Curated annotation (Swiss-Prot):
Lineage: Eukaryota, Viridiplantae, Streptophyta, Embryophyta, Tracheophyta
Subunit-structure text: Protochlorophyllide reductase is composed of three subunits; ChlL, ChlN and ChlB. Forms a heterotetramer of two ChlB and two ChlN subunits.
Protein origin, superkingdom: Eukaryota
Reactions it catalyzes: chlorophyllide a + oxidized 2[4Fe-4S]-[ferredoxin] + 2 ADP + 2 phosphate = protochlorophyllide a + reduced 2[4Fe-4S]-[ferredoxin] + 2 ATP + 2 H2O
EC number(s) on file: 1.3.7.7
Protein's recorded name: Light-independent protochlorophyllide reductase subunit B
Intrachain disulfide bonds: none
Cofactors, names only: [4Fe-4S] cluster
Family: Belongs to the ChlB/BchB/BchZ family.
Location, primary (coarse class): plastid
Keywords assigned: 4Fe-4S, ATP-binding, Chlorophyll biosynthesis, Chloroplast, Iron, Iron-sulfur, Metal-binding, Nucleotide-binding, Oxidoreductase, Photosynthesis, Plastid
Record keyword Plastid present: yes
Length: 103
């Protein structure tokens, strides 16, 4: 959650954390889904992609390389949605550098 917040990405929902059936109706409002652990949520993300065209990131952000790839994939998805607003294009390379600089 902290990484998403640091990148300025608003979280629609965290499933199953605090989720309820009433919250499910809001799932299609998301631009994309994050599946940090493939064992939990991947089938749901695949379903949402098929049904609603909602892409997902399924890289587990552990370690330097996978965390950087996780952030790059989110950057691509954010920029795909923000393509109508060129001045709002995301560039997370400085975030990746800051997070991995002293490791």
């Amino acid at each position: 959650k902290r990484s998403l917040r640091d990148l300025g990405i608003l979280v629609n929902q965290i499933i199953p954390e605090g989720g309820s059936l009433k919250c499910l109706k809001d799932l299609p409002r998301a631009w994309f889904n994050v599946v940090p652990y493939r064992e939990v949520g991947l089938m749901t993300a695949i379903f949402l992609e098929k049904e609603y065209g909602m892409p997902y990131v399924s890289v587990t952000p552990m370690g330097i390389l996978d965390t950087a790839e996780f952030v790059r994939q989110m950057e691509r998805l954010v920029n795909a949605w923000a393509s109508v607003l060129p001045e709002k294009q995301a560039n997370y390379s400085s975030y990746i550098k800051d997070q991995t600089n002293f490791v």
